[in-house]
């Protein structure tokens, strides 16, 4: 994974933002930190359906059984939200991902109430897709 903060630092940084404009800019910055996705990984198998933007997420299990996530989107805010999700699932096994509830983290960040309905649906689609694929790997 690219140089991203851990869960606790993400929450600290997010709460230090003075307003929602700063928070959106921080989310976009997180997306910019994601590693470049290989062009051949932008394929139908990795496409996340249910997002208005184009979104691709690749999951691989490393030698230690930890899931490594990579992704990309054609929308900066969506790519940033993807980075937030990747931070929350960082260093987890497939089974950990299946059982981990991201919603309390989103509540702490007050994220859901500040996203448009289409962004919220896209975020949910990303989470559902990651959890579904993790279930097949666990």
From Swiss-Prot:
The keyword Cell wall biogenesis/degradation does not apply. Keywords: Cytoplasm. GO terms for cellular component: cytoplasm. Transmembrane segments: none annotated. Pfam families: SufE. Pathway: Cofactor biosynthesis; iron-sulfur cluster biosynthesis. Homodimer. Interacts with SufS. This is Cysteine desulfuration protein SufE. SUPFAM superfamilies: SufE/NifU. Belongs to the SufE family. The active site is at residue 51. Participates in cysteine desulfuration mediated by SufS. Cysteine desulfuration mobilizes sulfur from L-cysteine to yield L-alanine and constitutes an essential step in sulfur metabolism for biosynthesis of a variety of sulfur-containing biomolecules. Functions as a sulfur acceptor for SufS, by mediating the direct transfer of the sulfur atom from the S-sulfanylcysteine of SufS, an intermediate product of cysteine desulfuration process. One of its GO terms (biological process) is iron-sulfur cluster assembly. InterPro entries: Cysteine_desulfuration_SufE, Fe-S_metab-assoc_dom. It is found in: Cytoplasm.
